[in-house]
């Protein structure tokens, strides 16, 4: 798949911008705060219905306007997709795909698949487990509508259970029993799907990581959960929830479940989060992203669009070379402040250059 064109009205610093894209490599060059990342953000939003930079949709609207409009035309092997999104300052939004109204975000996902790599993605390795859970959830939601549904249901029931814990009495105890059964059902599915995804990452990611590091490093991903028997995860999770209820009542929160899980990234059997160098951590994220590309390709039969937001300057020459030599079959949209460092690795015949200045884009 690839994006043919993008039309933005009142989006961030763009008044009215229409952009034709190459199906190959697109490079947006400009100083900071000129609008390069805004282009990627609009594409990312058209893919999953949320921004990678803010939780507030109103932040996407040009400061003096009441709404913003995004149109993304996507070329697919079977059926092209036109995604139209209107976002209003009052919190409402309207989304259509090929003029059919989208009622749930799950109906939007899968029409345009993207994988984004930005400097902030280093948090997946370095920071709290929540960043790693978010990575897994986003990648799984792209390819599995059932996962999206069960994740939404799990979080809804989890919130209700936590509220019940804060207002506990003997009657509420029976309600918590019902919540525990529901959490076990949805939670077990989430745990098993996350573990399966990490199994796929291990198979694909190991080969990618060896290519990047010239066979010097071996990477491994391991899911960290209190559940020991994945085949009986629902039963085991229910037992542990009941066992931990007293502790949960004291803390007014649910202490166990997929919302507390994590995954470990190790290089040569060493925990990358704690002991890895910054270079190793960046390479681990690079492996995650390129493995995710391959997983999506294996499932839907097409590569997603790759978005690289000012990350090439963060990589050494070997990593830059790997990235630019690996995208010949993938529509890639790159933002950077200059192309001097990567110019020697670019396929000029397959690359389109754009200059970005204060919300204006010039094709070179």
Swiss-Prot record:
InterPro entries for the chain: DNA-binding_RecF (IPR001238), DNA-binding_RecF_CS (IPR018078), P-loop_NTPase (IPR027417), RecF/RecN/SMC_N (IPR003395), RecF_2 (IPR042174)
Entry keyword set: ATP-binding, Cytoplasm, DNA damage, DNA repair, DNA replication, DNA-binding, Nucleotide-binding, SOS response
One cellular-component annotation, GO: cytoplasm
Binding positions for ATP per the UniProt entry: 30-37
Source superkingdom: Bacteria
Molecular function GO terms recorded: ATP binding; single-stranded DNA binding
Subcellular location(s) per record: Cytoplasm
Coiled coil: none
GO biological process, one term: double-strand break repair
CDD domains membership: ABC_RecF
Family: Belongs to the RecF family.
HAMAP family listed in its UniProt record: RecF
Entry-linked PANTHER family: DNA REPLICATION AND REPAIR PROTEIN RECF
NCBIfam families: recf
Function according to Swiss-Prot or TrEMBL: The RecF protein is involved in DNA metabolism; it is required for DNA replication and normal SOS inducibility. RecF binds preferentially to single-stranded, linear DNA. It also seems to bind ATP.
Name of this protein: DNA replication and repair protein RecF
Organism for this UniProt entry: Clostridium botulinum (strain ATCC 19397 / Type A)
Gene from which the chain derives: recF
């Amino acid at each position: 798949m690839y994006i043919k064109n993008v039309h933005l009205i009142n989006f961030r610093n763009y008044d009215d911008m229409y952009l034709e894209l190459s199906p190959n490599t697109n490079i947006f060059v400009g100083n900071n705060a000129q609008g390069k990342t805004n282009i990627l953000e609009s594409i990312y939003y058209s893919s999953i219905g949320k921004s990678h930079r803010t939780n507030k949709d109103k932040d996407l609207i040009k400061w003096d306007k009441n709404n913003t409009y995004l149109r993304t035309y996507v070329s697919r092997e079977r059926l092209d997709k036109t995604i139209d999104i209107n976002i209003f300052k009052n919190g409402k939004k309207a989304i259509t795909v090929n003029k059919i109204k989208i009622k749930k975000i799950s109906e939007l996902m899968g029409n345009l698949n993207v994988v984004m790599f930005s400097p902030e993605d280093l948090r997946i390795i370095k920071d709290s487990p929540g960043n790693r859970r978010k990575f897994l959830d986003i990648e799984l939601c792209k390819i599995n509508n059932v996962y999206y549904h069960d994740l939404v249901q799990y979080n809804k029931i989890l919130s209700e259970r936590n509220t019940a814990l804060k207002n506990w009495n003997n009657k509420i105890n029976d309600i918590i029993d019902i919540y525990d059964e529901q959490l076990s059902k949805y939670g077990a599915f989430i745990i098993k799907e996350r573990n399966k995804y990490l199994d796929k990452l291990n198979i694909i990611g190991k080969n990618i990581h060896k290519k990047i590091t010239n066979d010097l490093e071996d990477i491994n991903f391991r899911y960290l959960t209190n559940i020991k028997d994945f085949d009986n995860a629902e039963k085991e999770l229910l037992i542990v929830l009941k066992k931990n209820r007293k502790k949960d009542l004291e803390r007014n929160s649910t202490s166990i479940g997929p919302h507390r899980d994590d995954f470990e990234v190790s290089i040569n059997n060493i925990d990358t989060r704690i002991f890895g160098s910054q270079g190793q951590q960046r390479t681990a994220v690079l492996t995650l992203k390129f493995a995710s590309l391959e997983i999506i390709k294996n499932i839907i039969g097409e590569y997603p669009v790759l978005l690289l937001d000012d990350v090439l300057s963060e990589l050494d020459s070997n990593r830059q070379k790997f990235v630019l030599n690996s995208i010949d079959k993938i529509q890639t949209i790159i933002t950077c402040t200059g192309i001097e460092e990567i110019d020697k690795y670019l396929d000029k015949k397959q690359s389109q250059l754009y200059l970005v200045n204060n919300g204006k884009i010039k094709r070179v």
